[in-house]
């Protein structure tokens, strides 16, 4: 019966996941239908605008060239008409002079003939006909205004839609996730020398499968990539996966996005559990600050809260959500998990296997600071490193500066400069807890033991503050040092 019930649960889970997948695909199809309508309308409007622009250019060219013909015709007509008028006047003058000469010649016996002949001779000398050029000032040839648009017509007939680059193909085998960096490699399915650049988009997600259309996280965009690979650096992996897609662009248009891919981004992500903190510690997500008045203020707030009563969380609020299997449930509201001189706060996520890494930066002026791990059984009054349930590195700046490793009330003084940022690497199954200078990755100390219970990140501070960085992968340099045995074995013999 139990097996059938379990099998039915699996079927229900499978069907629910499949239904969600189909619903997401239906939503995608509906969105694509809307996009087809909107995009086709847009490209149609763009096409009409481009042709209208061509028509306008052709019309402007036509008007300009017609104006040139009209101006040339008017100029030549003016010159020829002026020349024609001058020739007509010269001809009339010449004909009058010819008639006078004929008449004078017929009256040779008259006494005034010599004088008349002399006047005719002088008139011929001054006649316009003999000063007139009989060559046309302009030509009637208009061949310089002829056109032949055969080549342009062929170009217009060759008009077509812009060539769109193919969608790239992301090469998962060559892509890499390491050191909180992602190197994405892709290739083009065919050779295209006209590609100008690529556009890469990525987003975070907690879903392993194909990227879903509905996501809370927006796509982040990186433009102007010239190579077929790109490395994203300095990422914080606060979700389990990342989606990636890339498209190619020429100087005119962008192609389709590649098939999106999902890469796992394993990292240790936790928050500081304010319900576990000492009342003198003011906790804000991943930051902690010592507050000398914290206890008194807390007592006042508690009394006010008791007087007003409590309000239940809404049914659908996160407060009623199912916690992660490794996420610790919230503790008591009175913030008395640690008290007296145990100025401690714990992380909210259990470590029960695998390798994990996180970093913490503390205020150098803090009088005391400690970082490490602890079992959940760590007592209210117990300080980090003073019982068998906790391991830590401790910095003391009060009265006398000391830098020590502590476990089970045993102390080892560390001969190393105190960094302002510490890296913590926990390999649960190997029983290794190593501390590093977060900047140089120099090993400061390594505990070698056998963890018998799940662990929690643990911190302590007195008269100071610190900031935790999570969502980090185990650095490659740390893995390399561990494999090469760089962590000194002799430093652990007194602290196991």
From Swiss-Prot:
Residues 268-477 form the B30.2/SPRY domain. Residues 164-268 form the Fibronectin type-III domain. One of its GO terms (cellular component) is cytoplasm. InterPro entries: B30.2/SPRY, B30.2/SPRY_sf, Bbox_C, ConA-like_dom_sf, COS_domain, E3_ligase_FN3/SPRY, FN3_dom, FN3_sf. The keyword Ligase does not apply. Residues 4-99 form a coiled coil. The keyword Cytoplasm applies. Pfam families: fn3, SPRY. The modification Omega-N-methylarginine is found at residues 310, 320. Keywords: Cell cycle, Cell division, Coiled coil, Cytoplasm, Cytoskeleton, Methylation, Microtubule, Mitosis, Nucleus. Residues 301-336 are annotated as: Disordered. One of its GO terms (biological process) is regulation of cell division. It is found in: Cytoplasm, Cytoskeleton, Microtubule organizing center, Centrosome; Nucleus; Cytoplasm; Cleavage furrow. PANTHER family: E3 UBIQUITIN-PROTEIN LIGASE TRIM36-RELATED, FIBRONECTIN TYPE III AND SPRY DOMAIN-CONTAINING PROTEIN 1. B30.2 box contains a microtubule-binding site. Oligomerization is required for binding to microtubules. This is Fibronectin type III and SPRY domain-containing protein 1. The lineage of its organism: Eukaryota, Metazoa, Chordata, Craniata, Vertebrata. The gene is FSD1.
